[in-house]
Amino acid sequence: PTPSVEVPLVDFFCDPNGVRDEVNTLLVNKRRGYNAYFPMPFAKSGRIELVYDGPVEPGEELWRLMPCYSYVMYRTVDAMPEDCGYLHASWRQEALLLGARDYLALDAKGRGKFVGWNVTMRLPGRDGYPVDQNEKFYIDGESEASVEFQGIEDSFGFSWGFPPTESQFPLTGFYRFMKGAMGYRFFVQDAISFEKSLRVMIGFGVNEDPMFRREFSKRGNSMQLSSTVYWYQTEPHAPFPAMLSA
């Protein structure tokens, strides 16, 4: 069996480049330690692994450079609800011409609910980034998304672009990522449910100014996006994309 959660450590905790002193959200936070508060039900067993795949061999030198310890709080129950979903999280990263095709953040099969994500966006080697992409949620095989946010900043709680200063709130927030931006949002009371499948994509909407599609279809205008998506679903889950090696 494959893990239900497979994400780079810092991305899981809404700190994609790993340099922030502090992250404050309702479900994950960071300040001299990483903490997560997602409910993580399991019926028979649960296993959490932190995998290091860097160049330093295990031993005293690695411990000196990267000391690590952890604790997990859990409780056992006599039975779980039959329809109880399991926490899933998956990470993706891609550089692409958004004027030519959309970015795929999630392609889930099964029954469940989407509860949040964090997304980074940047134009490598350049200042600034477009914010006119829409976030599209195709539920149960839809050909047209029944949930679509207009403008990437709007779905993270802002409008007319991201603000000039970083903002952290319990469920939404934004901060700088290299020369681009990172936004997070958790859908606690407004989770997006699906019965058979959910496909989440980022791209220009059908009513977008054609100029944006032309501009971001040109060679050299590739946009780099990454995303960590959090959702609950019944098993089995569809295979995750392969993780990039360090």
Please place each PLM-identified region on the residue numbering.
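Beta-strand-centric surfaces of beta-sandwich/beta-rich domains
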Residues: P1-A246
